[in-house]
Amino acid sequence: MTVYHFVGIKGTGMSSLAQILHDMKHTVQGSDYEKRFFTQTALEKRNISILPFDKSNVKEGQVIIAGNAFPDTHEEIVAAKELNIPVHRYHHFLGDLMNQYTSVAVTGAHGKTSTTGLLAHVMQGAHPTSYLIGDGTGHGVENSKYFVFEACEYRRHFLSYNPDYAIMTNIDFDHPDYFTDINDVFSAFQEMALQVKKGIIACGDDEELQKIQAKVPVIFYGFGEDNDFQARNIQKRTDGTIFDVFVRNTYYDTFKITGYGNHSVLNALAVIALCHYENVDVEAVKHQLTTFEGVKRRFNEKPMGEQVIIDDYAHHPTEINATIEAARQKHPEREIVAVFQPHTFSRTEKFLDEFAESLSKADQVYLCDIFGSARENKGELTIEDLQKRIDGAELITDTTTDVLKKHKNGVLIFMGAGDIQKFEAAYVKEVQVAEK
């Protein structure tokens, strides 16, 4: 019996892939740091063993899948090579796996995870679909027709894939620790486009995506009249969004989604276009769009007394704009309070003015200290450099969250890609203790 051993199983992509293989009746285990990470809940539900790193975890007869964060000098990878066991890097293994299905890669600087989750949910309503989402969610179906997965542009990892279809949500400059500028990012997406086998669904409102060249048809979607799939007559309501879809200027149908903000309409439009191209029944699409409950760490909302708390992964100015816009649509009468933890010194420094501009759209801003990534843990920049660019912004720590209580009817948006949830948890605990 083959055992799939994951080196770094708590990584978001690795966790998802482990779940998929387990659901397909393979034996799966993995190792990682002992610190708890949100992805391990799904692994524990499936009784997938999570071991501390140790070279003795590696045994003959296993298939070793290694996370991208772990170098060839890692003790388990060294042990595998000593035993002549092939080591598969995560993105290469995934690239091979998807070839068994009609595969759809979802990529873009922003909106990947939400769009992947929405597409997987909609496709499941019509056909057996396996999926891998970048929030640590994976699901495998043995007789799948489709394989839907999130494909990340960082370090050009998505070039390991040759999908049947690609949805491209946007091109924007991010990951300044790797990409040099927007042209460098575009070149990565252009190279990816040439590897797609059947068709590309791209946002035509994005100036960079308009320049994409491909060997397959490129279907454009968006709000602009030049798009193949266009959203019109948009009704932004507190219970979701309704819009008409026109295909090449001919009315197609009316759709309702549970999401808020223009970005949610665009994500849905991409899914509608892909489903139209694959002849998925439109009634199934309409139904599934109304039952989508979202993905982890993307506008996850919960009431707490008179306040509303939202947890969101937004860590780029474009994403912060979208999250605040969505909150205002759903809660037009409430005060919007942003609690933001910048992620990486390089990104914060590169987009300092843009962060200030986007955060200023909230009614009040609280800033947590900068979260350094594993690749960098110090920088000359400080959180005060951002604070002084935002009128009235205050600094906050996980021991001073009680200041948030004064926003009696507020929507508190905890945003960031680091450990911002630590601050949210501290505040929830503070409120619960005060209520006793």
From Swiss-Prot:
This protein's UniProt keywords: ATP-binding, Cell cycle, Cell division, Cell shape, Cell wall biogenesis/degradation, Cytoplasm, Ligase, Nucleotide-binding, Peptidoglycan synthesis
EC main group: ligase
The keyword ATP-binding is assigned to this record: yes
Catalysed transformations (reactions): UDP-N-acetyl-alpha-D-muramate + L-alanine + ATP = UDP-N-acetyl-alpha-D-muramoyl-L-alanine + ADP + phosphate + H(+)
Cellular component GO terms, alphabetical: cytoplasm
Designated gene of the protein: murC
This protein's name: UDP-N-acetylmuramate--L-alanine ligase
Primary site of residence: cytoplasm
Family membership noted in the UniProt record: Belongs to the MurCDEF family.
GO molecular function: ATP binding; UDP-N-acetylmuramate-L-alanine ligase activity
GO terms classed as biological process: cell division; cell wall organization; peptidoglycan biosynthetic process; regulation of cell shape
Pathway info: Cell wall biogenesis; peptidoglycan biosynthesis
The UniProt record lists the keyword Cytoplasm: yes
InterPro entries assigned to the protein according to its UniProt record, in alphabetical order: Mur-like_cat_sf, Mur_ligase_C, Mur_ligase_C_dom_sf, Mur_ligase_cen, Mur_ligase_N, MurCDEF_pg_biosynth, UDP-N-AcMur_Ala_ligase_MurC
Function: Cell wall formation.
Classification of source organism: Bacteria, Bacillati, Bacillota, Bacilli, Bacillales
Annotated binding of ATP, by residue: 108-114
EC number annotated for this UniProt entry: 6.3.2.8
Localisation: Cytoplasm
Domain of life: Bacteria
Pfam family membership, one: Mur_ligase
